[in-house]
């Protein structure tokens, strides 16, 4: 237990440390166990807020609204978005940059700027907006890569703030999922972060796995969690 808590803390980050494959699998499996333990605590808190605050204030159950939103995603395309494409895009945005290398920052710039301009990662049709978004995003990422190549001190400065960037990433990742709740009421704005705790927990575990095991492991964990939610 002590070894598990030590591994899943941010006290010691050394993404250059190479773990044997068997050790990686063990830490990955323990991460799933840790996730479910923390999720039980988060769900209990969400239930208490739902019953004793949300309903008392005269609003419908936020927890039920979240479940209804999840049920609307179905079929093979829904599976592709939830289990494959969604986790890949979110990991590229929120986790890749946690190891602040030029290549990673450039890829982050490309994906982030593309989403800002195209407004979604769903590729419904090839049109001028899509092509322009790809061109501008590619140009921006190339400029960022060349800038970091000429000024490596920027990369170093970002690396010194790795823990802070990780925690900010975890919080933003969780808060982003508040948008999945149907019929948002701004009167409940201070309570909605409670319902983002499950995503913050998964985001934290993904972040640690990305930093200590590698990008692929964080992506695999993310996809597995989404798969279980999709099948449920």
Predicted regions and their residues:
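Transmembrane helix-loop-helix hairpins at the membrane interface
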Residues: 82-88, 92-232
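Perimembrane loop-to-helix junctions flanking transmembrane segments
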Residues: 53-75
């Amino acid at each position: 237990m002590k070894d598990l808590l030590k591994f899943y803390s941010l006290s010691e980050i050394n993404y250059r440390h190479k773990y044997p494959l068997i050790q990686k699998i063990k830490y990955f499996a323990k991460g799933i166990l840790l996730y479910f333990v923390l999720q039980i605590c988060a769900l209990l808190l969400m239930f208490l807020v739902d019953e004793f605050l949300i309903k008392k204030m005269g609003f419908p159950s936020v927890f039920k609204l979240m479940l209804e939103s999840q049920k609307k995603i179905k079929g093979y395309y829904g599976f592709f978005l939830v289990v494959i494409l969604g986790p890949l895009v979110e990991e590229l945005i929120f986790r890749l940059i946690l190891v602040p290398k030029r290549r990673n920052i450039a890829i982050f710039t490309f994906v982030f700027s593309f989403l800002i301009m195209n407004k979604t990662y769903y590729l419904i049709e090839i049109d001028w907006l899509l092509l322009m978004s790809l061109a501008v995003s590619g140009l921006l990422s190339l400029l960022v890569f060349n800038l970091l190549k000429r000024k490596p001190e920027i990369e170093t400065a970002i690396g010194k703030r790795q823990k802070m960037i990780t925690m900010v990433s975890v919080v933003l990742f969780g808060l982003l999922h508040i948008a999945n709740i149907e019929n948002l009421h701004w009167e409940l704005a201070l309570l909605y972060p409670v319902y983002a705790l499950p995503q913050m927990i998964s985001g934290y575990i993904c972040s640690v796995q990305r930093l200590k095991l590698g990008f692929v492991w964080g992506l695999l964990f993310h996809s597995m969690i989404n798969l279980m939610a999709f099948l449920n």
